[in-house]
Amino acid sequence: MTTAVEEDEVEASRAPLIEHLTELRSRLIKALIAFVLMFFACFAGAKYIYNALVWPYVLAVGSPEKAHLVYTHGLEYLFTQIQVAAFGAGFLAFPVIAMQIYKFVAPGLYKNERRAFVPYLVATPVLFVIGAACVYFVAMPLLMRFSVGMQQLATDTSPSIEFLPKVSEYLSLIMTLIFAFGICFQLPVILTLLARAGIIDSQFLKDKRRYAVVVVFVIAAVLTPPDVISQFALAVPTLLLYEASILSVTMVEKKRAEAEAARAAEE
């Protein structure tokens, strides 16, 4: 039989759980509201967002008049606009979603842990935007120029072969590249967090550099379309970020050593 004391302990432990679940529900609802509002806003301007995403193709062919995209069934362009709206909503609502996650986690962190967490919260979207910019200004223009350059003009002995991307396939391509670059550009954040947790150190990263090169190219081959241009466009910046991560981890180790020396001096 359970005693009154044990029942009180069960009730006391149950109360914090209910409070956490209530808080989680509140944060999820706020994040969902932000996403839905951004979705409708982006859907209203989906045409303009898509036109902006198509600009690397426009640059490759020379002018908007020469850029032709097609869709092969009636609702394809509508579904593409819905995808554009969802893509834009996720991008624009991310600061709100990240803040809700932070506000849910922050009460369980010490003050110094909260201060340490904030730079990563800021660095994550910044690095993602840099990755997306690399896609928009470097990878996609190179890929589009290469694709347009493969066209064949009609002659007396050969047919005309034109590059006519589908609206859905173009969107899928640029979204895949943006997500691939955005995720890979989080490498400094991930490795620095692992260093703070004591799982890796700068010497480990230096020793495994040759293996990192192989892994990066394999990941680039998996995440990008099967063409050499986009694979190299992803692999090269990621390797540079790996080197930057070594510097970041070295700084973490230096600060940790200084903090330990200060504590030892106080003792």
Regions found by a protein language model. Give the residues of each.
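Membrane topogenic/interface segments and analogous intrinsically disordered interaction regions
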Residues: 1-267
